Curated annotation (Swiss-Prot):
This is Regulator of microtubule dynamics protein 2. The modification Phosphotyrosine is found at Y152. The gene is RMDN2. The chain crosses the membrane at residues 10-27. It comes from Macaca fascicularis. GO terms for molecular function: microtubule binding. The modification Phosphothreonine is found at T139, T154, T157. Residues 68-110 form a coiled coil. InterPro entries: RMD1-3_a_helical_rpt, TPR-like_helical_dom_sf. The keyword Cell inner membrane does not apply. Residues 122-151 are annotated as: Disordered. Pfam families: RMD1-3. PANTHER family: REGULATOR OF MICROTUBULE DYNAMICS PROTEIN, REGULATOR OF MICROTUBULE DYNAMICS PROTEIN 2.
Length: 410
């Protein structure tokens, strides 16, 4: 038999086999639908969440439901991990781009016999107390797992003794202050962006003396939150967030009726959640809301709390179907909020403190734009232009408001 005929015969057999396979597949899907399992409509754009349950979508089979929920959670965890890794990779690439030219310059200086002085960023300047005897100890990141208040496990929980200390080149004298003077000074320093690092250092200098004083404790936790905001390094941010959360949790345990302790615990839970997987993100979100509500009851005249509550409501109102379903799987109910509820909280912050902040005006403009009240949205954009731009958050808010104004004028 010619070679070409063999090839035609083989090809014919392959086509025939494929046809039979397709026929069998059609038979199982069309002729026997009762034996197939319905899959949930992940891509549905219908936002009706009132009576949908995972059990309805998997034939009310309890065992299958549990397995499906576990697989769903695993898939979401993997996707979240992938996104986190991509962000970390971007950060490392950016760091390398900045470092390589400096490394070349350093090598040239060393070869030329020059002595190089290393510059330290403000967030690295966490001072060590001067001790009578020099103690040397190896510092390492804690790998112990600590169970938090929410009843779940968080790895790599730091303590306040673990920091990024750098020897001071000058001004090694530490002025000893009494508690009232210290608190007034750190509160005043914190009013400016540049003073936050100095405020943090001042608290570090006095932590051994006042570490059990509740007014010192929550301010120290707040200062770690400030350092989180100032830092641009991912590992540093994670470090500051974990220490601050631990300190604020201790403060709550010592003074459960102090609203500031609950406020900063909520804020630092939000910071820590940035480095967690999806399940812990949702857990920390639950803690954030819980302690924010407690803080509002204890400090009803604090505008910052209503700003935070507004941000929470606005974020929840924008959650996707799958994110709401995940929260329902973990906590038994779907988190719900509306743009109107967010708007109410932002307006409350403005009522308590007119001209409260650029970010508050930005979110007011966003809410009104979402509600198609364009005149009110433009009103708050214009009011924001009258406020000074001091912090990094102020600058970001101004940029966002420029975008809002551009979109509203189209």
């Amino acid at each position: 038999m010619p070679h070409s005929t063999n090839k035609e015969l083989i090809f014919g057999i392959m086509v025939g086999t494929a046809g039979i396979s397709l026929l069998l597949l059609w038979y199982h899907k069309v002729r026997k639908p009762e034996k197939t399992m319905k899959l949930p409509k992940f891509l549905s754009l219908d936002n009706t969440f009132n009576s949908i349950t995972l059990q309805d979508e998997v034939h009310n089979d309890q065992g299958t439901t549990v397995i499906f929920q576990e697989r769903q959670l695993q898939i979401l965890e993997k996707l979240n991990e992938l996104l986190t890794n991509m962000e970390e990779l971007k950060e490392e690439i950016r760091f390398l781009k900045e470092t390589v030219p400096k490394l070349e310059e350093y090598i040239q200086d060393e070869l030329g016999g020059k002595i190089t002085v290393h510059k330290v960023s403000p967030q690295h300047r966490a001072r060590k107390r001067r001790l009578p005897t020099i103690q040397s100890s190896a510092t390492s990141n804690s790998s112990e797992e600590a169970e938090s208040e929410g009843g779940y496990i968080t790895a790599n929980t730091d303590t306040e003794e673990q920091s990024f200390p750098v020897p001071k080149a000058f001004n090694t004298h530490v002025e000893e202050l009494n508690l009232d003077v210290l608190l007034q000074k750190v509160d005043h320093l914190r009013m400016s962006e540049s003073g936050k690092s100095e405020s943090f250092e001042l608290l570090c200098d006095h932590k051994e003396k006042f570490r059990d004083k509740i007014e010192f404790m929550w301010r120290f936790a707040r200062a770690y939150g400030d350092m989180y905001e100032l830092s641009t390094n991912t590992q540093e941010k994670k470090h500051y967030a974990n220490i601050g959360r631990t300190l604020s949790e201790r403060a709550i345990n010592r003074a459960p009726m102090n609203g500031h302790c609950h406020l900063w615990y909520a804020v630092l839970c939000g910071y820590v959640s940035e480095f967690e997987g999806l399940q812990n993100k949702i857990n920390y979100g639950h803690l954030f809301k819980e302690h924010l509500d407690i803080a509002i009851k204890l400090l009803p005249e604090e505008p910052f709390l209503y700003y935070l509550k507004g941000r929470y409501c606005y974020t929840v109102s924008k959650l996707s179907w799958i994110e709401k379903k995940m929260a329902a799987t973990l906590f038994g109910k779907i988190p719900s909020s509306t743009v109107q509820e967010a708007l109410h909280n932002f307006l409350k912050a403005e009522e308590l403190c007119p001209g409260y902040s650029n970010p508050n005006y930005m979110y007011l403009a966003k809410c009104y734009a979402d509600l198609e009240e364009n005149q009110n949205a433009l009103k708050f954009c214009n009011l924001a232009l009258l406020l000074p731009t001091v912090t990094k958050e102020d600058k970001e808010a101004q940029k966002e408001m420029q975008k809002i104004m551009t979109s509203l004028k189209r």
